[in-house]
Structures are given as structure tokens and as C-alpha cells.
Amino acid sequence: MIEVKGVTKSFDDFTALDNVTCNIAEGCIYGMVGSNGAGKSTLLRVLSGIYKADKGEAIIDGINVYENTYMKNKLVFVADELFFLAGANMKSMAKFYSSIYDNFDMDRFTELTKTFGLD
């Protein structure tokens, strides 16, 4: 169960989410539709614990996701833009993510980079 309770998130003078409340039952699939700047990605970032809501809370399976290592290890968020540390390559990014995610599989990373001819 995903619960969003009165979530508000602002950036300077722009309010991306304004008192958003919704419940998504286990096994349900929803899509979000909206124009650029409507708050879709912001809501997903709050749900994945990347952003902290200014007000309200995001709860998954009864657990608040922000600053919760256990829950973050169970979630993945793939943004529409790639994130790389300045000057980083794939191996340094893999090392970075392995330091954040306990279940990051370096052997699988190496296998996939070889399979797809990446370096």
C-alpha cells in the first residue's frame, strides 16, 4: 500500500505539490498524466525518498520512506534525466551506488557492462 498524506513540496517560489493525498492499493497500476511542471516527477521523488516533503508524508507498506535506508533499498527510481557525478565514468558511478544500496550487485554490473560492450 502506498499512502500519500497531505504532501506539499515547493522549490523557492514554485509549489510543485500542494496538499496531495492519495492511496494506492497493493497490486494496482496507475499512470500519471500532466503537463511539464505539473509535479509528476516530484511526487515520484518524494515517494522514493529522494525529496523530503515540506508538509505531509509518503508511506509505503506502513513505513515513511524519507531517510529510511531499509525502504530505499527496496525502491528504485529511474528519472527521465541521467545523473552522473561530475567527471565520473560508469565504474565510479557503480562504486557510488554500491555505497548507497546494500543490495547493489557489482558482479551483475560487470556482467552487464561486458554483455552490452560498455566501459
Label every PLM stretch briefly:
Residues 14-15, 69:
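Short coil-to-beta microelement around the adenine-binding A-loop and adjacent beta1/P-loop entry
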Residues 2-4, 17:
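Conserved structural motif at the start of ABC-family nucleotide-binding domains
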Residues 30-35:
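The feature captures the beta-strand-to-loop junction immediately N-terminal to the Walker
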Residues 56-67, 71:
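Conserved ABC transporter NBD signature motif
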Residues 48:
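Helix-to-loop junction immediately C-terminal to a conserved catalytic motif
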Residues 79-119:
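ABC-family P-loop ATPase nucleotide-binding domains
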